Swiss-Prot record:
Pathway: Carbohydrate degradation; glycolysis; pyruvate from D-glyceraldehyde 3-phosphate: step 3/5. It comes from the Bacteria. Catalyzes the interconversion of 2-phosphoglycerate and 3-phosphoglycerate. Its cofactor is Mn(2+). Belongs to the BPG-independent phosphoglycerate mutase family. It catalyses: (2R)-2-phosphoglycerate = (2R)-3-phosphoglycerate. Keywords: Glycolysis, Isomerase, Manganese, Metal-binding. Its EC number is 5.4.2.12. This is 2,3-bisphosphoglycerate-independent phosphoglycerate mutase.
Length: 505
């Protein structure tokens, strides 16, 4: 007899917002979502700031969202931990950071600092760069080179000059530091093995073959004149006495989110790297703020805090079968992040990875691989052996990042079509679905003056529980979703999962 599956369906980047202006969620024709919304119990929950372990007012993101959802509690994020360590002064006593600097001082070499130069707070925060500069000054490092990756995605599309000017003011205040290279994150922070992009960033960082400008500002302004926004600035070298990352140097990469920092790190710190031909840097001390992946030989500045009793582990302990399914862009989120930073499958877990389309930007194919994800899930459901399903539709977030309204509306409409087939199938099997999101984005893709808005929002996300006859609490947070799943599965909630079921009892 087929099992009755319980599914968590995450519409990535899909939040509630009253105004229709630039709101693809409101403007899209989504008959299936609306049908479930009108028929079943609903509420909305918080997905940003203190509710997900981020600083107050900080927008949520997919990594943080999935981590909180899977843990069933507030998970204090790297950004919050690092900020606190700087405030407490522990940062300046950190062994790994001090070892990197000791390496430079003993080799009379250079300290290179890599990172995303913005206050987006999703992958990095430029105030962490300032703390590194202060530490280097305190320890008497003379040669400090900053390799800046421009954002334009988690912050305004053309905001780089503000961060560059503030950083140069910090260089002047401390009397150390200079920009050595600048790359748009499209090149330096790819995560889909598009090595031809990373190679351009690598060449600029190694001072090999890249356009050269007198200042960082001049290079960015030239890029703007060519119609490029920060994210897409072609990597360039800033003229100075720096000759790139060399033997005996040290690198500190201050991005704390792993997924878009791993590839560049593999080029420098994975001896088995084969993406393209590289000249290995000898005796390089390579440090990363967090652990990016197992292939990278790096010293870790902030070790991971282990999370036990995530939704996957509880399912395993109760002999339940589970499926994690998403396309490439969100696959790490339904697996690694949902499992609290664990890569290995749990007993009874299987996974389906559907390739994301190979297009330059997803506004060119707003449906992405939603239909293929849906087909794969229906195939899995037909096996009749699943207790728990965790599914992510990437489109509202990934297309929302384009800041283009029409493609984002199309993205949501494609997802809605798939949602209808999936949920109806689950209901036919006497199962339940929780339809929700991890953070906002597609709810505002235009600013009030109709400029593209490519960032996430701090708006609350909807929750639909397809179980008639129950009442949901009026408020909650992402950490309440796993307890709600356990409630539907009739599984006892462990003590360290401190969220509360959204179903009133």
């Amino acid at each position: 007899m087929a099992k009755k599956p319980t599914a968590l369906i995450i519409l990535d980047g899909f939040a509630n917002r009253e105004s229709e202006h630039g709101n693809a969620v409101k403007l899209a024709n989504k008959p299936n979502f609306d049908r479930y919304y009108n028929k079943y119990p609903t509420t909305q929950i918080e997905a940003s700031g203190l509710d997900v372990g981020l600083p107050e007012g900080q927008m949520g993101n997919s990594e943080v969202g999935h981590m909180n959802i899977g843990a069933g509690r507030i998970v204090y994020q790297s950004l919050t931990r690092i900020n606190k360590s700087i405030e407490d002064g522990d940062f300046f006593e950190n062994d790994v950071l001090n070892n990197a600097i000791a390496h430079v001082n003993s080799h009379d070499s250079a300290l290179h600092i890599f990172g995303l130069l913005s206050d987006g707070g999703v992958h990095s925060h430029y105030k962490h760069l300032f703390a590194l500069l202060e530490l280097a000054k305190k320890q008497g490092v003379e040669k400090v080179y900053v390799h800046a990756f421009l954002d334009g995605r988690d912050v305004d599309q053309k905001s780089a000059l503000k961060y560059i000017e503030e950083t140069e003011a910090k260089f002047n205040e401390l009397g150390i530091g200079q920009f050595a290279s600048v790359s748009g994150r499209y090149y330096a922070m790819d995560r889909d093995k598009r090595w031809e992009r990373e190679e351009k960033a690598y060449n600029a960082i190694r001072n090999f073959d890249a356009p050269t400008y007198a200042t960082a500002k001049e290079g960015v302004e030239a890029s703007y004149n060519e119609g490029l926004t920060d994210e897409f600035v072609v990597p360039f070298i800033v003229e100075n006495q720096n000759d790139g990352v060399n033997d005996g140097d040290a690198v500190i990469f201050y991005n704390f989110r792993p997924d878009r920092a791993a590839q560049l790190s593999e080029i420098f710190a994975n001896r088995a790297f084969e993406g393209f031909k590289v000249e290995q840097v000898k005796d390089l001390f390579y440090a990363t703020f967090t652990k990016y992946n197992d292939n990278i030989d790096a010293a870790i500045v902030f070790e991971k805090v282990d999370l036990n009793n995530t939704i996957g582990e509880i399912a395993q302990n109760n002999n339940l079968t589970q499926l994690r399914i998403a396309e490439t862009e969100k696959y790490p989120h339904v697996t690694y992040f949902m499992s609290g930073g664990r890569n290995e499958e749990f007993k009874g877990e299987r996974r389906r990875l559907i390739d994301s389309p190979k297009v330059a930007t997803y506004d060119l194919k707003p449906e992405m691989s939603a239909y293929e994800v849906k087909d794969a899930l229906l195939e899995e459901l037909n096996k009749g052996d699943l207790d728990l399903i965790i599914l992510n539709f990437a489109n509202p977030d990934m297309v929302g990042h384009s800041g283009m309204l029409e493609p984002t509306i199309k993205a949501i409409e494609a997802v809605d079509e798939c949602l209808g087939e999936v949920v109806d199938k689950i209901l036919d099997m006497d199962g339940y679905a929780i339809i929700t999101a991890d953070h906002g984005n597609s709810d505002q893709v235009l600013t009030d003056d109709d400029q593209p808005m490519t960032t996430h929002t701090t708006n609350p996300v909807p929750v639909i529980v397809t179980k008639e006859g129950v009442t949901l609490r009026e408020t909650g947070r992402l950490g309440d979703l796993a307890p709600t799943l356990l409630d539907l599965l009739n599984v006892e909630q462990p003590e360290d999962m401190t969220g509360e079921s959204l179903i009133k009892h």
